């Protein structure tokens, strides 16, 4: 016992030694509670340093996680604070357990230390650790164990608590990397289930280190344990030792040997891998973990850190050196805690210490041992201890929270998309109209409301708009409903704002290169949506007319962003905000605030406005908001009198700038600050206030840290109102262009602009519209011209703009990026409700490419959700390549693969240059229709097959080793294992150091082969390609066993190397050979009779390998060659699977039995030795390896057994893992059809080229390739390209506002007007009246524009007779020729009204589209009205548009059913243009004449022609029967026509029967030709491209018509042709591009039934009878309630309503038996027959869309249901019940 006596001179100066002990274990308290309380304290005003530490720790950990390969990174859930990870139990038991626990221990101990040292009572702690004079030795020491000693280094190098934050997060980074590194190395020693809690260390009590070491040496020598797998002593104390090693070997040690089993022992909670292992790790490993720390040079060790091995302080001169020494000790040195105790005691003895204070994080055994030892060694020395965790238990004063600044990070905008007025369907078109200085206002389009009835410039009519103008998106109803999993019904009822929001969100994300969960910032849990919207027009007006299923989810605002979150699976918040005109920018500011606060990491934000409600126009007019003149906003004009309303939809994607840079995003612009305030002191709520606006600018500029004079552009709110413009100009000039005080220099010009002058005021979308404009300005380097000043500038604006250096750009002005200063802009957006929002925007940083991409070949992918879109995407990419021939192929591949969503219709191409790529894409475009989409059942299974020896060059140059850090680290780790086992390094054999024919000893060749395959398999797994079954060929089995978990990588390398050494020492190279024979086993036996040989391998039906002595093989080869079999001698030194290996078998088996551990396989293994699939652990052992060395490799039988047991099938994708694809040929030969096979490497080909081709195949097969991992090594050198966006398969989903109820609304104002209108209806507007144009009910003419509306009653006798003269299905049908006469009549009337001097009008009827037949009703006593509207904006443009609508008897107008355009022309010009064609057509007519004479073509008389026509489709009245004779061959014919004299029968401009007579030859061909299936189909025309006659059609005159109908490429059921009409061998008329579509004859009743008949009504009740000329498009399923017709059927048949007693089964893979007597059974048989399916195809999970049941087939089957089963259903039945199972269940429920 040493008695401690303080030195006499020290009595007056008591000195205390402070010892801080950092444990390697968590305290026994609940860790989550401790960290939660630590986090809570960090919010207190007294702990700003703690708050910064936790914030920085979170940031650093996120950064480290982002560097992990994807399969590991995705294990870490999204986290707002590192402290929350303590509760992630699954994470802390998984592969990253040691890394995460190391981080949490760092956070806990450093956080508690910082918090303790910051506390008012103990603030001096940290200062006391350090001497005031750095030359003086400190009276403090730092100790610790494991990660704890690493934590202590942060304290050692920090002279302040602020320094401790910086050093602490660096230590946290190292701790995380240490855990990952140790886990990776340990994984090669033993692949342990991370959740199995198998320990890598046991403590043994009562055993000395010498005893333990002797026992271990003896045991492991006897077992021949490979050196890398040996158990070793890792820690020593006086009473115990700790032994460490692979868990399975530790278990065996304590199970099998009494010297350990019989002592007291316990396993330690060490689950992450091995440390303190000098035989495993080296100095360079420590350097790899530490790398280059980012600490400044001033960080140096000040407080000594005691080595846990030597007990002496580490001697380091810098922080980096200290970190490296500590990590090296943790990895390689034994823990000898007694040495630490001794070292501290020595320090006490050497210094003038009066007492010792030990600081601990809760009391622990090592700290207690230290205290006890000091007390025992030195009597009378006071030793006390403080708990640094005690303070965290104190209550937090919630009144003194100080959350700190949330405005530290700038916000990057990384993607944008828009739909703007003026046809701006993308940002490029938007820029084009801005740059061109366009004002895109126009009259309110008809799809919104009838502007004429809802507009009154006098303002006298109630509820009308004073203006008829606005700025509008073209066809806002266009939408790709199936893409977004919406049915047509849901799409139609969903607000177009919501639809365009999700479309532009997708496009913005696509342009941002967004891929879900690719990086921490794109974690789905951390993404939210924010959209501004200020109206609900579509819900209030359009869908409100007939409220249905989707009225609420389709119309309520919250569902817009909610739908985006739901579709993309974003789990962050979704907000819809309304602040009136500032909605979008205020919402974007709110989204920025969420980013600044850390609530989310990625944001999709924007604004929405689509105008359909006339009320808003009326209300704004009455509130004096809107301009009365036809223009967009007259911003800054002296006559500005209000704004012009506008549509607008814009979406942007935002991230924090550091996240965007880390994600390698394109940064379109950066937001340093944004803010909102309110004009509280304005004279009225809607009036702006310059003072408050100026305050806002100063606030936001201060927040951004930017001088207002450095702003070079301001985007005004600029609505074009006198008050608003003047106030905003005043506020802007006061702050950004002042005349007093500091002013702008000549080099600081300020330009201003306002986008509303171009596209109007988008209201809720105005802010995002302005923001996108400025983003485009930054992108294009230009400021577009301002077009708002129509007359002269607002006189209230400053007269000294020049002195202020303030400029309005009246032409495009350069605004280029310079190196001198940033371009900075301000965007304003104000609210009519008083809010002001301002956002500062600056250009993004310039980023340099780091490194280069050496890959010579790249893979390019294109995908879509439909074939139409796939074609469009391919076409867009081809067009892009044509415009950008010098595009970087590496960038293009990266952008198309790693930065895009991948859908189920896929193509992939591998190319080295744009020309080659373009040709491949063109080729693939041609084959899209024949491509099969990915299966809906998910990705196909993957099998890895590992190549045997002999496939590679003797020396390899693996490009993957040089350029893939992961692959290289794997190979180097495996190479080190080999060296630890005593084998030479194999790296020179694979790194290209030697020529490819340089031979190596077998031990190097075979270890290299196995190691390359293990590393390659793991590389495939990082790319997302994971096997479900493995197979190995010969030597390849060892790598297969590693991947299947049977052997550790260490054991496999040991076995392969040992076997090779045995071959070298016990066998003679070159005495035996192996010979491949292109013949079957039986053929070989027949050919060589009794000659001796060994059957080495049976690889395929015709692939066999023999082995034997050299003499035997040469002898055997002779008869085989004589038989014509191909023979190849393999270049291998030893003949495996032959008698040559006999000398090594016993020794090898014994070595395998004693030295390695076999574990149960985690994957099925296809065993070529056993010829079957192995699942159990008993089959794979040392004896198996012996037999595999000598026995036959029966690869063929193994493959056949795998197929028979369904382990693999035709869908299995095979990846050959090896140096050259050999086995895939055997696999293809074993399967019919051949499966998809992919090689990894190929001799003579760059690795990247082979991998690119293989990944393309795997991608198109449907596997989820992790493209980000593939590009990761080169990402710093790659850039995201701004490629064309998705090509939508759009249809117009729109509910038209009908009538004028928005005006009347129950008021009495319009009662009198209605009476006047009724009187006016009785008195026609015009005297014009013909049979087809019976009454002009409205006409308006203004200058050169005009509108004429006619209404006719189909029941009028002459018109009804004309319809009945064209009977189909016994119904009178208005033929296209009647439509033609209407157009000729109205077209001439309109033209002459506007150009009264015109004498002759020649009209070309173009683009006629009839979407639904107009069929005469059967009740002739009730009117059947239809209406045609003709309009022209400018008659001098030579065109007018026509629209047909049905009109109900109550005046309700239905949706248009036909449209066309008239183009006025010159008859003489037409004649001259046709003249060159006449002889060509005449030549065809002469050919038909000759064919008729030869009996090849058919000749029909007048009567025969019309009899056949009537029998097959159309029964024509006599006056229509103008064809006198017809000659026809297949789809080509001519007819001689004489137009009939008809007396009476009505008045016409061009009689319909004249038009029909010369044109219906096309219909005759399609419905009579023997080339058509007229028995089962009929053909009708939906219209034509052009119809014109240069001369009048005259009764009694003779004409000749000719036409040839040709099927279209896109749809073989649609035919096109040009009808030429001759008079005297001159072409005088033509019907160009007349179209006929073929339909099943069964649909005749559905298409052509009198609208008041019972059958038509039943179709209407079932969902509509479908259009006459087109059918609904397929769409995704919905689950609506039972159809109304079914309800009626059930009421009529009560027994049918009884539900089936057994519910329909769940989806199964096999088709259930069909009960053909049941209704459901009959229905399925009917479906199978109609669709040409087998009963086996009708599995419950089979989707009708995948079975080829398209919209047309749906109509046919629905008709069959009605006819054969008596079930009336809609054609949409298969959308509502999209699978066989769903339909079966429905039928059984309602019809069983």
UniProtKB/Swiss-Prot annotation:
Encoding gene, per UniProt annotation: AacuL
Region: Product template (PT) domain, residue numbers: 1330-1650
Enzyme Commission number(s) of this protein: 2.3.1.-
Region ranges (C-terminal hotdog fold): 1496-1645
Stretch forming the signal peptide: none
Biotechnology (record note): Secalonic acids show unprecedented anticancer activities against various human cancer cells and might be interesting for further derivatization, targeting diseases such as cancer.
Domain description: Multidomain protein; including a starter unit:ACP transacylase (SAT) that selects the starter unit; a ketosynthase (KS) that catalyzes repeated decarboxylative condensation to elongate the polyketide backbone; a malonyl-CoA:ACP transacylase (MAT) that selects and transfers the extender unit malonyl-CoA; a product template (PT) domain that controls the immediate cyclization regioselectivity of the reactive polyketide backbone; and an acyl-carrier protein (ACP) that serves as the tether of the growing and completed polyketide via its phosphopantetheinyl arm.
Organism name: Aspergillus aculeatus (strain ATCC 16872 / CBS 172.66 / WB 5094)
Function: Atrochrysone carboxylic acid synthase; part of the gene cluster that mediates the biosynthesis of the tetrahydroxanthone dimer secalonic acid D. The pathway begins with the synthesis of atrochrysone thioester by the polyketide synthase AacuL. The atrochrysone carboxyl ACP thioesterase AacuM then breaks the thioester bond and releases the atrochrysone carboxylic acid from AacuL. Atrochrysone carboxylic acid is decarboxylated by the decarboxylase AacuI, and oxidized by the anthrone oxygenase AacuG to yield emodin.
Stretches assigned to coiled coil: none
Pfam families: Acyl_transf_1, CurL-like_PKS_C, ketoacyl-synt, Ketoacyl-synt_C, PP-binding, PS-DH, SAT
GO MF term (any one): fatty acid synthase activity
Protein name: Atrochrysone carboxylic acid synthase AacuL
Pathway(s) annotated for this protein in UniProt: Secondary metabolite biosynthesis
Enzyme kind, highest EC tier: transferase
Residue intervals of the Ketosynthase family 3 (KS3) domain: 408-843
Key words, A-Z: Multifunctional enzyme, Phosphopantetheine, Phosphoprotein, Transferase
UniProt region (Malonyl-CoA:ACP transacylase (MAT) domain), positions on chain: 944-1263
GO annotation terms (biological process): fatty acid biosynthetic process; secondary metabolite biosynthetic process
Reactions the enzyme catalyzes: holo-[ACP] + 8 malonyl-CoA + 8 H(+) = atrochrysone carboxyl-[ACP] + 8 CO2 + 8 CoA + 2 H2O
């Amino acid at each position: 016992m040493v008695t401690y006596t303080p030195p006499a001179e020290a009595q007056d100066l008591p000195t205390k030694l402070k010892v801080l002990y950092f444990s390697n274990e968590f305290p026994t308290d609940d860790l989550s509670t401790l960290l939660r309380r630590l986090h809570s304290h960090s919010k207190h005003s007294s702990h700003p340093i703690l708050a910064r530490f936790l914030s920085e720790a979170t940031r650093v950990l996120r950064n480290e996680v982002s560097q992990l390969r994807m399969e590991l990174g995705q294990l870490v859930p999204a986290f707002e604070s590192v402290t929350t990870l303590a509760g992630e139990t699954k994470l802390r038991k998984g592969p990253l357990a040691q890394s995460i626990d190391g981080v949490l221990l760092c956070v806990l101990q450093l956080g508690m230390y910082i918090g303790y040292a910051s506390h008012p009572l103990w603030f001096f702690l940290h200062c006391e650790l350090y001497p005031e004079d750095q030359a003086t030795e400190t009276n403090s020491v730092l100790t610790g164990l494991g990660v704890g000693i690493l934590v202590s280094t942060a304290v050692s190098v920090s002279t302040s608590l602020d320094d401790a934050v910086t050093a602490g997060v660096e230590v946290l980074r190292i701790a995380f990397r240490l855990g990952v590194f140790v886990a990776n190395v340990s994984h090669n020693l033993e692949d342990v289930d991370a959740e199995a809690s198998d320990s890598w260390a046991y403590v043994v009590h009562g055993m000395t280190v010498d005893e333990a070491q002797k026992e271990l040496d003896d045991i492991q020598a006897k077992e021949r344990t490979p050196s890398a797998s040996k158990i070793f002593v890792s820690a020593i104390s006086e009473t115990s030792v700790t032994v460490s090693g692979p868990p399975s070997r530790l278990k065996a040690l304590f199970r099998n040997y009494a010297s350990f089993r019989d002592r007291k022992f316990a396993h330690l909670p060490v689950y992450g891998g091995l440390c303190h292992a000098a035989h495993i790790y080296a100095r360079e490993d420590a350097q790899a973990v530490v790398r280059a720390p980012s600490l400044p040079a001033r960080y140096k060790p000040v407080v000594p850190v005691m080595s846990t091995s030597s007990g002496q302080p580490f001697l380091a001169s810098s922080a980096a050196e200290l970190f490296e020494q500590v990590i090296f000790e943790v990895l390689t040195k034994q823990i000898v805690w007694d040495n630490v105790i001794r070292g501290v005691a020595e320090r006490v003895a050497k210094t003038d210490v009066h007492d010792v204070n030990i600081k601990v994080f809760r009391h622990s055994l090592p700290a207690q041992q230290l205290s006890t030892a000091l007390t025992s060694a030195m009597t009378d020395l006071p030793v006390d201890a403080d708990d640094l965790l005690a303070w965290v238990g104190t209550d937090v004063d919630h009144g003194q929270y100080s959350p700190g600044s949330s405005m530290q990070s700038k916000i990057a905008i990384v993607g944008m998309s828009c739909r703007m007025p003026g046809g701006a369907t993308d940002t490029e078109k938007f820029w084009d109209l801005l740059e061109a200085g366009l004002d895109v206002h126009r009259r309110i389009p008809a799809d919104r409301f009838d502007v004429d009835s809802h507009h009154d410039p006098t303002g006298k009519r109630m509820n009308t708009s004073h203006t008829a103008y606005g700025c509008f998106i073209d066809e806002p109803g266009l939408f790709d409903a199936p893409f977004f999993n919406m049915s047509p019904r849901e799409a139609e009822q969903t607000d177009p704002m919501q639809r365009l929001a999700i479309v532009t969100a997708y496009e913005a994300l696509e342009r941002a290169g967004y891929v879900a969960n690719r990086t921490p910032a794109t974690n789905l849990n951390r993404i939210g949506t924010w959209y501004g919207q200020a109206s609900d027009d579509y819900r209030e007006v359009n869908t409100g007319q007939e409220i249905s299923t989707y009225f609420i989810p389709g119309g309520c605002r919250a569902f817009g962003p909610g739908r985006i979150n739901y579709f993309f699976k974003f789990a962050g918040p979704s907000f819809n905000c309304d602040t009136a005109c500032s909605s979008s920018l205020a919402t974007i500011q709110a989204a920025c605030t969420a980013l600044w606060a850390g609530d989310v990491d990625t944001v999709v934000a924007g604004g929405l406005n689509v105008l359909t409600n006339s009320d808003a126009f009326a209300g704004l007019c009455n509130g004096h908001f809107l301009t009365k003149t036809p223009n967009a906003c007259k911003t800054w004009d002296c006559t500005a009198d209000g704004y012009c309303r506008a549509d607008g939809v814009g979406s942007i994607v935002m991230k924090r700038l550091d996240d965007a840079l880390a994600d390698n995003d394109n940064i379109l612009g950066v937001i340093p600050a944004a803010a909102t305030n309110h004009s509280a002191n304005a004279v009225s709520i809607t009036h702006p206030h310059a003072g408050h606006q100026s305050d806002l600018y100063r606030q936001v500029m201060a927040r951004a840290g930017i001088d207002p004079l450095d702003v070079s552009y301001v985007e005004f709110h600029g609505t074009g109102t006198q008050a608003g413009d003047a106030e905003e100009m005043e506020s802007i000039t006061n702050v950004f262009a002042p005349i007093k005080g500091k002013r702008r220099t000549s080099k600081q010009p300020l330009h201003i602009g306002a986008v509303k002058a171009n596209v109007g005021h988008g209201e809720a979308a105005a802010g995002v519209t302005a923001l996108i404009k400025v983003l485009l300005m930054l992108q294009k380097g230009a400021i577009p011209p301002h077009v708002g000043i129509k007359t002269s500038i607002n006189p209230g604006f400053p007269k000294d703009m020049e002195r202020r250096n303030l400029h309005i750009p009246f032409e495009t002005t350069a605004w280029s990026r310079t190196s001198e200063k940033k371009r900075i802009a301000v965007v304003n957006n104000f609210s009519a409700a008083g809010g002001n929002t301002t956002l500062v925007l600056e250009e993004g940083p310039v980023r340099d490419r780091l490194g280069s991409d050496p890959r010579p070949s790249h893979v390019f992918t294109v995908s879509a959700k439909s074939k139409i879109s796939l074609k469009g995407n391919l076409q867009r990419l081809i067009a892009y390549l044509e415009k950008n021939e010098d595009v970087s192929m590496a960038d293009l591949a990266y952008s198309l693969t790693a930065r895009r969503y991948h859908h189920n219709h896929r193509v992939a191409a591998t190319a080295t240059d744009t020309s080659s790529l373009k040709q491949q894409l063109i080729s693939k475009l041609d084959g899209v229709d024949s491509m099969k989409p990915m299966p809906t059942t998910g990705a196909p299974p993957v099998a890895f097959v590992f190549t045997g020896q002999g496939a590679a060059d003797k020396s390899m140059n693996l490009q993957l080793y040089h350029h893939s850090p992961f692959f290289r680290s794997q190979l180097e780790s495996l190479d080190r294992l080999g060296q630890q086992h005593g084998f030479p390094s194999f790296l020179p054999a694979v790194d290209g150091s030697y020529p490819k024919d340089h031979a190596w000893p077998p031990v190097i060749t075979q270890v290299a082969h196995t190691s390359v395959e293990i590393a390659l398999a793991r590389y495939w797994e990082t790319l997302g390609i994971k096997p479900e079954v493995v197979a190995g060929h010969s030597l390849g089995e060892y790598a297969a066993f590693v991947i299947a978990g049977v052997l550790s990588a260490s054991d496999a390398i040991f076995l392969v190397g040992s076997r090779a050494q045995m071959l070298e020492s016990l066998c003679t190279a070159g005495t035996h050979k192996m010979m491949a024979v292109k013949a079957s086993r039986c053929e070989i036996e027949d050919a060589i009779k009794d000659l001796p040989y060994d059957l080495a391998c049976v690889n395929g039906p015709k692939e066999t390998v023999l082995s034997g002595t050299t003499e035997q093989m040469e002898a055997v080869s002779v008869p085989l060659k004589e038989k014509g079999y191909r023979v190849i001698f393999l270049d291998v030194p030893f003949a495996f699977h032959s008698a040559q290996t006999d000398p090594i078998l016993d020794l090898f088996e014994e070595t395998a039995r004693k030295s390695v551990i076999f574990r149960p396989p985690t994957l099925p293994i296809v065993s070529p030795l056993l010829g079957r699939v192995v699942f159990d652990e008993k089959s794979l052992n040392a004896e198996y390896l012996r037999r595999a060395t000598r026995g036959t490799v029966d690869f063929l039988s193994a493959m056949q057994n795998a197929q028979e047991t369904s382990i693999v099938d035709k869908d299995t994708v095979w990846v050959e893992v090896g140096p050259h694809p050999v086995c895939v040929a055997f696999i293809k030969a074993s399967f019919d059809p051949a499966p998809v096979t992919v090689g990894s490497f190929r001799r003579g080909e760059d690795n990247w080229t082979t991998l690119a081709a293989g990944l393309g195949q795997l991608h198109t097969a449907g596997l989820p390739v992790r493209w980000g991992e593939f590009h990761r090594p080169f990402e710093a050198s790659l850039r995201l390209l701004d490629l064309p966006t998705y090509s939508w398969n759009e249809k117009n989903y729109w509910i038209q506002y009908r009538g004028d109820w928005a005006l009347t609304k129950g008021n009495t104002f319009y009662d009198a007007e209605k009476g006047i209108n009724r009187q006016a209806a009785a008195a026609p507007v015009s005297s014009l009246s013909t049979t087809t144009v019976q009454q002009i009910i409205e006409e308006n003419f203004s200058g050169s524009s005009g509108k004429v509306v006619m209404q006719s009653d189909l029941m009028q006798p002459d018109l009804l007779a004309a319809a009945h003269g064209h009977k189909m299905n016994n119904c009178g049908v208005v033929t296209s020729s009647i439509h033609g006469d209407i157009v000729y009549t109205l077209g001439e009337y309109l033209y002459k009204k506007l150009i009264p001097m015109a004498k002759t009008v020649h009209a070309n009827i173009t683009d006629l589209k009839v979407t639904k037949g107009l069929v005469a009703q059967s009740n002739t006593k009730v009117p059947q009205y239809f209406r045609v509207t003709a309009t022209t904006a400018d008659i001098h443009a030579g065109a007018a548009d026509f629209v047909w609508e049905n009109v109900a008897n109550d005046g309700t107008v239905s949706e248009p059913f036909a449209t066309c355009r008239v183009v006025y022309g010159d008859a003489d010009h037409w004649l001259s243009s046709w003249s060159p064609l006449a002889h060509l057509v005449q030549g065809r007519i002469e050919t038909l004449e000759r064919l008729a004479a030869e009996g090849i073509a058919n000749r029909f008389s007048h009567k025969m022609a019309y009899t056949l026509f009537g029998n097959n489709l159309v029964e024509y009245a006599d006056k229509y029967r103008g064809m006198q004779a017809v000659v026809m061959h297949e789809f080509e014919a001519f007819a001689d026509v004489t137009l009939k004299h008809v007396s009476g029968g009505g008045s016409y401009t061009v009689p319909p029967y004249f038009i029909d007579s010369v044109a219906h030859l096309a219909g005759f061909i399609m419905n009579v030709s023997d080339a058509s299936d007229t028995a089962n189909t009929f053909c009708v025309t939906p219209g034509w491209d052009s119809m014109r006659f240069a001369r009048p059609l005259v009764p009694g005159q003779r004409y000749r018509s000719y036409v040839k109908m040709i099927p279209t490429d896109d749809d073989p059921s649609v035919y096109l042709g040009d009808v030429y009409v001759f008079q005297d061998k001159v072409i005088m008329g033509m019907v160009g591009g007349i179209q006929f579509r073929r339909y099943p004859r069964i649909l005749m009743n559905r298409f052509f039934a009198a609208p008041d008949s019972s059958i038509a009504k039943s179709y209407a009740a079932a969902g509509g009878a479908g259009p006459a000329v087109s059918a609904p498009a397929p769409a995704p399923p919905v689950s609506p309630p039972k159809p109304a017709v079914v309800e009626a059927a059930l009421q009529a048949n009560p027994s049918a309503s009884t539900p089936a007693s057994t519910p329909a089964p769940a989806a199964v893979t096999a088709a259930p038996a069909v009960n053909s007597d049941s209704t459901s059974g009959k229905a399925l048989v009917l479906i199978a027959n109609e669709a040409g399916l087998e009963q086996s195809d009708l599995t419950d999970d089979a989707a009708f869309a995948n079975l080829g049941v398209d919209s047309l087939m749906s109509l046919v089957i629905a008709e069959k249901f009605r006819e054969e089963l008596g079930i009336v259903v809609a054609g949409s039945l298969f959308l509502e019940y999209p699978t066989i199972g769903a339909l079966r269940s429905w039928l059984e429920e309602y019809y069983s």
